[in-house]
Structure formats: C-alpha cells, structure tokens
Regions:
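C-terminal structural segments of small proteins and small subunits
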Residues: 51-77
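Alpha-helical structural elements
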Residues: 5-7, 33-34, 70
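Generic secretory/membrane-interface signal
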Residues: 2-3, 20, 61
Length: 77
C-alpha cells in the first residue's frame, strides 16, 4: 500500500489494484485508528468516513486539495 503523503499526523495512502473493476482515483486517510476515503477528481470529495470529526474531515480535505497533483501522479505511476 503506497504511502503518498504524511501531514499533521494524517497518513494518505492507496491500495494497488483495488477493486474489480479497478476503482477511479481515490485516497485513503488514517489517523489514530480513524479512516476516511476521498475520491480525487477536480477536487477531493468525501466518500466514506469512520471516526473522524467534521473539523478533522475539513482539515483532511484542505490537505488533499492542496496536494491533488501529488496524489494523482502517485496514482498513475
């Protein structure tokens, strides 16, 4: 599972060859046992969240949007 980014304690990663058929570009985020998934399009869009507060999700979304190009490049490698 490639780690793409680590910022403010959040680990951003994805699984290689996830889903059948392969899912569109997305990123998983974890911190302190909490987990979220964002679709990566023109901006990061929340798919699922388990345990994160609304404030944390806002922070995650800001980080993801700031790093969209990095996430997309890692996905396409």
């Amino acid at each position: 599972m490639p780690k793409v980014l680590f910022e403010k304690g959040y680990r951003f990663f994805f699984f290689s060859n996830e889903g059948n058929p392969i899912e569109p570009c997305h990123i998983h985020i974890t911190k302190n046992g909490n987990l979220a998934k964002y679709w990566i399009k023109d901006s990061a869009e929340l798919s699922d969240s388990y345990g994160f507060s609304a404030k944390e999700l806002s922070e995650i979304e800001l980080i993801a949007n700031k790093n969209l190009n990095l996430i997309k490049e890692a996905w396409n490698e």
